[in-house]
Design a protein with these regions (language model features):
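C-terminal motif of bacterial Sec signal peptides marking the signal peptidase cleavage site
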Residues: 16-19
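Core hydrophobic alpha-helical membrane-spanning segments
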Residues: 11-12
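Bacterial N-terminal signal peptides that target proteins for export
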Residues: 1-7
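Feature marking well-ordered beta-strand scaffolds used for ligand recognition
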Residues: 23-424
Length: 424
């Protein structure tokens, strides 16, 4: 691993010279320093790293607070150009945890049997062509994978095939469903055994309902097209405060047409043949309604807008809605963080909100006092140390649901990071 001292010295010199009078600074000096910083960056993105504690605000060259680096696998390990979404699977027989890492050219499988020395087991190649967009979810020991690649459809992969594997290989899908061409995302309700493909070429980009209770026989059973393109969604069997919908299967969609139509859509999808709109609502300074997640009591919805930081120049903003009355959601809190980076994907586990924050990496918040409109950042791990500006670099997605507490971060330029809360 490159020592952080080298990186920081170069960065300091670069910033110092930039603040000098331009007449006193030779252009070739700026170029030399910029090239040196780029060389350090190249080394970061091609070096396998093992356990590095977070000490004095850094784990190696990565800014951090409260999270140690367990391991880092750069893109060169996977022979890929960029990373995107990721997810996790724990083998119910062996207890071994696996990361499913989305890449431009496929999906990589990584065993965490020894977390400080993760083992790359190989790749399921993209069904057709490479794409910077790929999304993965898991149900019943199977991975379900979609992509924006033309004619990609849905790949289904039996994860139990990874048992006992110790060497890298190229895999083939168990099922290749070609009922649709492209899709941006997939969500799964594990309580009902239905997958929801969104942003596809069907139903005008709205959710497509797929029965996956028989893993090798996925079947489209319906869809919804009335509220424009759905970018992401969470689906639950509702157990929140609105008594009218207790026990119903509800979809919370983040919808955008990339122009003026940006809104959250709540659907009752209990009857797949006749989904019903409960409500659709927008919000101030909407730019691109990207992704949201419910608190575990289903009362609050944490929403990320992907373009508001760029379009309106604000600090990173998370909009929290009170869904006590599902037919009339209320803005509860518009939270601004300490960085200007763009929020991408966020997930809630118990009283913590985990966010993939692009150039600011992983950000973790205590939400135990959300009723009192309070959030507190309690930790972070910055996989993109160059800056925390509003740009599309850094952490695309994080997976915080492993029982071990290990969090998998997919960084667009730098591959897979495994981090864990620093022991107190």
């Amino acid at each position: 691993m490159v020592k952080r001292s080298s990186f920081l010295v170069l960065l300091f010199l670069f910033l110092f010279f930039l603040n000098c009078n331009k007449t006193d600074l030779a252009q070739d000096t700026i170029t030399d320093i910029s090239d040196s910083i780029e060389q350090v960056r190249d080394s970061i993105t091609s070096t396998v790293s093992n356990f590095t504690p977070c000490e004095n605000g850094f784990a190696g060259i990565f800014p951090c607070a409260g999270y140690d680096l367990i391991a880092h696998l750069p893109l060169s390990v996977f022979e890929s150009q960029s990373a995107n979404d990721n997810w996790g699977w724990t083998d119910p027989e062996t207890g071994i945890q696996y990361v499913l890492s989305g890449l431009d050219d496929g999906t990589a499988f990584i065993s965490l049997e020894e977390p400080e020395s993760p083992l790359y087991l190989g790749k399921l190649p993209t069904a057709t062509t490479p794409s910077i967009w790929r999304d993965i979810k898991v149900f019943n020991n199977h991975a379900y994978i979609v992509s924006e690649a033309t004619d990609h459809g849905l790949q289904v992969f039996d994860l139990t095939r990874l048992r006992g594997k110790t060497e890298s290989k190229v895999y083939t899908a168990d099922v290749w469903m070609q009922d649709f061409s492209t899709a941006h995302n997939i969500a799964i309700n594990e309580d009902t055994g239905y997958a929801y493909v969104v942003g596809s070429n069907l139903y005008e980009g709205g959710p497509v309902f797929i029965d996956i209770n028989i893993p090798d026989q996925p079947v489209i059973v319906g869809g919804y097209s009335e509220e424009s393109y759905t970018h992401d969604a969470q689906i639950v069997v509702y157990n929140g405060p609105d008594q009218d919908y207790r026990g119903r299967e509800l979809l919370f969609g983040s919808n955008s047409d990339a122009e003026v139509n940006n809104r959250v859509v709540i659907l009752d999808v209990t009857d797949k043949s006749a989904p019903e709109l409960i409500t659709s609502f927008n919000y101030e300074n909407a730019a691109y309604t990207h992704q949201g997640y419910l608190t575990e009591d289903h009362r609050y919805f944490f929403l990320g807008d992907e373009l508001d930081e760029l379009n309106y120049g604000s600090a990173c903003s998370t909009k929290i809605f009170d869904l006590t009355d599902l037919s009339s959601p209320k803005l509860h809190l518009n939270y601004y963080s300490s960085v200007n980076s763009i929020d991408h994907n966020g997930y809630i586990l118990a009283d913590q909100f985990f966010m993939a924050n692009y150039s600011a990496g992983l950000r973790v918040f205590d939400i135990s006092k959300i009723n009192e409109k309070q959030l507190e950042e309690v930790g972070f791990f910055d996989t993109y140390p160059e800056h925390n500006d509003a740009s599309f670099n850094g952490a695309w997605n994080i997976y915080p649901f492993f029982e071990s507490g290990i969090i998998a971060i997919n960084d667009i330029e730098s591959g897979l990071f495994l981090v864990k809360s620093t022991p107190r």
